[in-house]
From Swiss-Prot:
GO terms for cellular component: bacterial nucleoid. Signal peptide: none annotated. One of its GO terms (biological process) is double-strand break repair. HAMAP family: RecO. Keywords: DNA damage, DNA recombination, DNA repair. Involved in DNA repair and RecF pathway recombination. Gene3D superfamilies: Nucleic acid-binding proteins, Recombination protein O, C-terminal domain. This is DNA repair protein RecO. The keyword DNA damage applies. Belongs to the RecO family. It comes from the Bacteria.
């Protein structure tokens, strides 16, 4: 029998589970894993918090694992204010969208890089839009940002609407919720200096995410609205 080996992980969420235990959702290169952490009030429990790089040994073959060993694998990412809210938003997105035990190593790497950028005080909106887009793309929900659903290049002066899971459709009559071609092309190039590109990207990602999140709102979004 092979001995379980540790793998890099971050805690996405933790809650009390039975006596002195916690039920923890982890993000790993092998996907989102849920595991029971025994003696959660001890040393291991102090590590089981978000934004701490960990090495975790998981035991068990079922969907609910057990934490065999958990150690710090680096310095915790320290965030406050809107950067902290942003990190909580990323965690909630991953819990809601990432299937259990579905490997997405690129998502793990981008998550770790985004946490570091948030801690360094980088502008929040470009980081969040990039994470949302790359998460959708990695899960198979992405679409072209430089061409419409017919494969035609986007026109700078064109107007488009999102057909979720299909792509961008050009329209010729004004209606609510449209996107300008210039804004979309700027998003494709991550050129946030173009006027309106960031606000349009936020609208576009909300539309793209909504169908996959279902009707239940994201709790972390409410944090940004509080005074």
């Amino acid at each position: 029998m092979s001995t379980p080996t540790g793998q890099p992980a971050y805690v996405l969420h933790s809650r009390a589970y039975r006596e002195n235990s916690a039920l923890v959702d982890f993000l790993t290169p092998q996907g989102r894993l849920r595991a029971v952490l025994r003696s959660a009030k001890g040393k291991a429990g102090s590590l089981a918090r978000p934004f701490v790089p960990l090495e975790v040994e998981f035991r068990g073959r079922g969907e609910l694992k057990n934490v065999g060993r958990m150690e710090s694998a680096g310095v915790a990412t320290w965030m406050t204010g809107e950067a902290l809210f942003s990190g909580m938003y990323l965690n909630e997105l991953l819990i809601r969208l990432l299937p259990a035990e579905d490997p997405h190593p690129a998502v793990f790497e981008h998550y770790a890089a985004t946490l570091l950028a948030l801690a360094l005080g980088r502008p929040l909106e470009p980081l969040l839009r990039s994470f949302e887009w790359r998460l959708l793309d990695d899960l198979g929900y992405g679409f072209a940002m430089d061409a419409d659903i017919n494969g035609e290049p986007l026109a700078v002066d064109g107007m488009y609407r999102l057909q979720v899971d299909a792509g961008l459709e050009r329209v010729y009559l004004l209606q609510p919720g449209l996107f300008q071609g210039a804004e979309l092309l700027a998003m494709s190039d991550a050129d946030w200096s173009v006027p309106g590109a960031l606000s349009a990207a936020k609208r576009l990602m909300r539309q793209a995410l909504a169908v996959h999140l279902g009707g239940r709102p994201l709790v972390s979004r409410e944090l940004f609205r509080k005074p």
